[in-house]
Each structure stands twice: as structure tokens, then as C-alpha cells.
Amino acid sequence: MIALSGFLRRHLLFTLLNLLGLAVGIAAFLLVSLYVAEEGTVDHGFTAADRLYRVGGQLNVGGQAIKLVFAPTELPGPLTQEVPEIEAATRMENDRVMLGTAPRFFEQKMLWADPNFLQVLDYPLERGDPATALARPDGVVVTRALARTLFGDADPLGRTVQVRNGATLTVTGILAPPPQSHLVFAAIAAEAARGPKSWAHQKAASWTDISGAVTYVRLAKGASAKAVADALPAFVNRHNPPNPDQAGGGMDNMLSLRLDPVPDIYLHIKALGDITPGGDVGTLQVLGGVALLILGIAIANYTNMATAQAINRAREVGIRKLVGARRRQLVALFTGEAVALAALGTVAALALMELAMPAFQALVGRDIALAPLTRGWLLPLALATPLVVGVMGGFYPALVLSGYRPGEVLKGKAQAPGASRVRAVLVVGQFAVSIALMVATLTVQRQVAHVQAAGLGYQPESLYVVSNLPTGDGRAATLKKELAHLPGVRAVALSNLVPADSSESLSSFDLPENTRSTLRQARGIEVFTGDEDFFATYGARLVAGGGLPAGWKAEAVDEQTPRYAVLTESAAGRMGYTKPGDAVGERLYADGKNPTEVVGVVADMRFQSARHADEPLMFQIKAGGRHMTLRLAAGDQRATVDAVNRAVDKFYPDTDYLRHGFVDERIEGLYKTERRQGQILAAFGGLAVVLANLGLFGLTALTAARRTKEIGIRRVVGAGVSDIMRLMAWQFTRPVLVANLVAWPVVWWALHVWLSQFTVRVDQAPLTFVAAGALALVVALVTVAVHVVRVASATPVGALRYE
């Protein structure tokens, strides 16, 4: 170690470069490991997590399986009675309510749940009894934060709180900080408190009626989930026998049930009706892969500089061999030195992690702490990292060093055959990774920008939305008329669906014998309401039809009056019409109610992410709705928005629960995952470029120092600085050019797979690949030039005296 410390002092620059590279690589790797660990623990904190399942519905429509979060409301009782493996079953329904005491109400996320909910999903209580907290018909348990909001410092237990225009609840428990879960809420209330709206009072007309109820089950110890899953088809048939009158399908024939393991819901299961966006496995894979590549670049840097410096330790090796050192002893010595440096790098990495933590938290959108590194599988990982990194980075240089022959060393003829080729391969690999990450970053950013504007089927610019309007009191219709007369407002519409929202309502329609459709029943049509101004406000493109009967008023629609609807092209196709125009004038029947007549077909309108296929939508023309959309005039819209908000405040003084915003912002929210992936690639791609050039900087310095005398001779015989620069630049830019040939096909294939998830996507532009390669080349040239110009500009006399 004395020899090592002396060597490190003599080569401080390269030691610091190695230490910095290893510290950055290890810090990136451990930060990502922390994030992956945090994401992987969601829903694992329940007592019997491995026996908890969500029973979800599944609609089999046109050969496509549509997963639903919801299941038939009446499910829990029959399940526990007929499936012996199920130990307990419970339901909950997600809601967003105004909670408080008059006149102060606060918008909160709340679950309505069965009495045994806290015994199945055992969220811990700080105060109260989980067995009885929801057994009380008006019981509610709240988080500490909500209790402080509602009651200040007063004892919340036993106090009452009101759902505005709804139930009065009594606080029966205080929730402890819950384990990380796919459910997000501030309160859980007894479902019976809803009175006439409760499940018991809203008896399903059909077993297949699906409201918003979500069912969870806990299996008995030792029970097989496969046995339960295998029993579900027969269970469904007993309660919902196939209907021969619906041979083509129908809700009665297309519903099945499935089991979702609760610990898998957050990361692995996406279903219609998900309460909160889950985690994204793709993001974890991108992060993990990029972090490993960053660590690989750091290891390659160490290997490259260690082999390039090997000649400087050749004399030490020769002397050690002369005094009896064996090769395996030298390999162990030099590998141990690498492990020691990696250990120092790990210590430095922990300091870097602390500094970088706020930026990393913002990047991944989650609060993360260093404390988990000391427990679970992360502790052995953190301890093993310097050992693995040191061995991987130091073993090959140790072989090179220990392979020197004493005689050749003492004669000054020591060489390391093959080491230069290995260094070239590693440099190619480093820059290939950097170039690939740059191409991926640019393509992801182009794709996100593209899908936010292309193929929407409407014009999102200048659309302003006011959401969560109360319905049924007539204020929205009056407000609409007033807003339509504001300067700067071009059109106003009311609807029950806006971009980035989901109707969560799939309907089936019967078609009469004389229809122009090839089907007698259409399934899986997503239905929502919009008034007669909806399409003009959104700028939808009419494909066929479009005229409402003269004198017809949307306000007059009820169960006794005719109903009219507009279909999207996908809905018309789903209904069996070969041409959109064939659907116009057709009458569709559902649930025995008055028919709905199709008056028009519009181009597909995409309200969800471009990851989803075009939705088959039916727009029932009806007055009212909980969303108001305004098309504003172009230009400076701040004054108009202020005027709109003032008018809304006048009609709804308690507007703390209304949400305002532009449609562009809502669409941006659909692509948070993709945008985050792009930011991750940009951040780590930049890190990869810096690390690769850090290694190149060290290699260039070593090469320039080793060729100082050669450069001096070339200067004496007339070579200029530019000649020396060209000579050295070609040596180090050639691997970068080769790296392009390696990176391009690999990243093209990876991006092709990623882009295939989208129904609307950009082409992989050749210019993107060329730009990334050119940027890497320019950065490499600048890095090389720093050393070459310094050495080439020195006086030849000094260079010829260099040893």
C-alpha cells in the first residue's frame, strides 16, 4: 500500500478522475436501486399481502379483453359462500367529496367501504378499533392531516363532519401513516351512510350491473389462487347464465371475472377505472438499464486508465517479481487496490447522493431517503457494490501489470500486447452508450410533443375547462349563457367528459332487424353526454350527418322524449356499419328505453393517451354536464380567463372544489410517464457523455504525456500544431465514429419497440441519429484538443528533454 500511495501522489490527476468517475457511477446505481426498492414495496405492507386479491371484471368485446377495476356490486356475499378458498370479501368505492362543516368544506378523496374493509385491507389506526370503526352506519376514519384541517387541535374522535349535500358522519378512528398503497385517500367512511344511494338500497336490476364498487378478497391460509381463478367461470355462469337471445354477446354474455394480486396492482396491472395512476415498469426498466450503463462506463474508465498507466508501474512489477512475488499475488494486490479505490468511490458516492437527492426526487416524482440503504436487500447491495466494481474494473489491469517480464522491464522494453485494443473497444462501448442515450432522448421528446397535438380529432388550442360543476340545479345552464356573451369567448359547451377524463361506462346496444349494420348487437361503446354546442366548441370534424330536428331542445330530454347521439368513426365501425354514413338515421336500443337515433358521425376524438386505440365513443346530445368547456379567442387570454373565473365565482361562491385549466395542460398530464422517461434519459444521457469524455480526457492526457518526445521531434522537423492535432485527433475520434455504427442499429430497434405502443407516432428521423453522433464527435474533439494543443504548443527543446 506504501507503493500505491506513492503512485497515487505522483499521478494525482488520474486518481481523482478515476475516483470521480466511480463515485458518480456508483451514486447513480445506488440512487436508482433506492427508487426501484421504494416502488417495489407498494401494497406489500398489509398483514396478509400475499393472500389479498382484487376481483375485477373483464369485458370480452370484439376479441379484445377490457380489464375493469369494478365488478358486480352483489359479488362479496356469494363469493364467500360458494368459494371455500375465500376467507373474507369486502367492497369499497372511490369518491371525491366536499367534506367539512358549514360553511367551510374541503375537497377530499374518500372511500365508501363495507364494515369489514379495515380487517381485509388492514390500514393501521392510531386511534379507534378497525373491527368496529366502520361497523357504525355513520362511521368515518380520517388521516391525521385531515383531522387537523377539520378540527384543528381539538380531539376529533366522536365529532361529526358533513359531506356537503349528503351524509353526516361521525369520526370513529384516526388513520396512522398508511403503508404505500395503490389507494390514495384522506378518509374511509361506512358505505351505509349514503342512505338511499348505498349498495343495499340500490339493488342491482341485473347481476351484471356494475357501479363503482371494487371488491377485494382475502384467501384462506394455504389456499390456491389458481383454484379460485379456475372456479370463477362456473361461479359467473351460476349467477349469470348465458343468454341465448344474445348469441352475439351482450353484457350478460361478455362479462367474466379475474383475480389481481394486490401487491401487483400498482406496478403491473392497468385497468379501466384505476383510482390513481400506478407505477410504470417501463420507467423502472429504463432507469435500471441506464444506471447499469452509467456504472459500466465508470468501470470502463477505470480499466482504460489503469491499463494506459500500466507502463508507469512496470518497474515496480519487475522488482517485485525479482524478489519472489508470484503472478497471482500481484493480481490480488492490484485488484485489491482497485477495490480500495472503489470503496473510497462509494464513500464519495454517498455524499454525492445526499447532494443530488432533491434533484433525483424531482426527476422521478417520489420522496426518497437514504435510510433504506441500511435495511433489506439494499444493505448487502451497497456493501457488495465496491467489491464487484473494484474486481470488474481492476482485474484486467491486474492481469496486464502482473504479466510484465522482469528482464524486459529492466531493459525498458515492457509492453502489454492487446491492451490498446481492449481500450479501443471500451472507448467504442462508452461512446455507443452515450450516443444511444442522446438519440433516445431526442426521439422521446419528439414523440411526446407529437402526440399532444397530432391525431386528436379536435383543436385543443385555446380550450379552457371548468370542472366539477354541481348538476341538477340549473346554475350551469345560466352560467353558460352569461359566459357566451363575454368578449374573448367564442363558444361554450357542457359535457360529462373532457380530454384526460374517462367515462368508465361501456354500453351495449341492440339494433333492429332492418338496420344497415352487419350486427344485431353492438358492445363496448363508451357513452357520455354533451350538449348541442359540444362539437362546434371542440372543432370536431363532421364525417356524416349532423342535423338535429328543428325545434328540438336538449333541455327537454327525458325518458319519454327521443334521444339523439353522434358517433365517432370507431363507434360506427364497432356497431357494424361499413360506411360512417350508414349509421346516420339508425335507431339503437338499450335497456328497453326509448331508442337513441344517430344524427351524425365525427372523426375519432382521442381523449386518452395515444397508447390506447381510438375509443368507440357515443355522444348523447343532452343539456347539462359537470364540465364546461370554453373556446377562447386567440391572443392574450389572461383578461378573458380572469373574467370567466369571476363569473364562475359569482355563480359558485364555494369554488374551492372547482378545477380550472386549459385542455393543453390536461393533455400534457396524460404523458407524464413519457415525459419523465425523456427527462431521465436526458439527465443520465448527459451524465454518460460527461463520464465518457472524462475517461477520454484521462486517456488523452496519458497518451500526450507518453508521446511528448515524439511530438517534440515532429515539431523540430517542421510539423505545426494543426498537424499534431490532426494526428492525435484521428486516434481518438475514430472510436467515436465506430461507436455510431454500433449504437444506431441497437437504439433504432429499441425505439421501434417503444414507439409501437402508440397509435400515433413519429418517424425515426435520420437527422436525429446524425445530430447525436456529431455532438459526441464534437465533444470528443474538444476534449482531445485541450491536451494536444497544450503539448504541441510547448517548445520542442522541453519536449526532447522529457522523460
Protein language model annotation of sequence segments:
Residues A298-A342, G695-T733, H787-V789, A794-T795:
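Interfacial "coupling" helices/loops that link adjacent transmembrane helices in transporter permeases
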Residues L111-D129, D138-G282, T478-T673:
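Mid-to-C-terminal secondary-structure elements
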Residues R10-Y35, G278-R315, A343, R421-Q445, ...:
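Hydrophobic alpha-helical transmembrane segments of multi-pass inner-membrane transport and secretion
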Residues V32-R96, D209-Y216, A229-A231, R258-Y266, ...:
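Membrane-proximal extracellular/periplasmic loop immediately following the first transmembrane helix
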Residues S5-F14, F46-T47, N237-L293, I311-A314, ...:
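Membrane-helix entry/capping segments
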Residues L8, N18, E39, V55, ...:
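Generic structural signal for small/hydrophobic residues in well-ordered secondary structure
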Residues A27, L31-L34, R258-V262, A338-P406, ...:
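Small-residue-rich transmembrane alpha-helices
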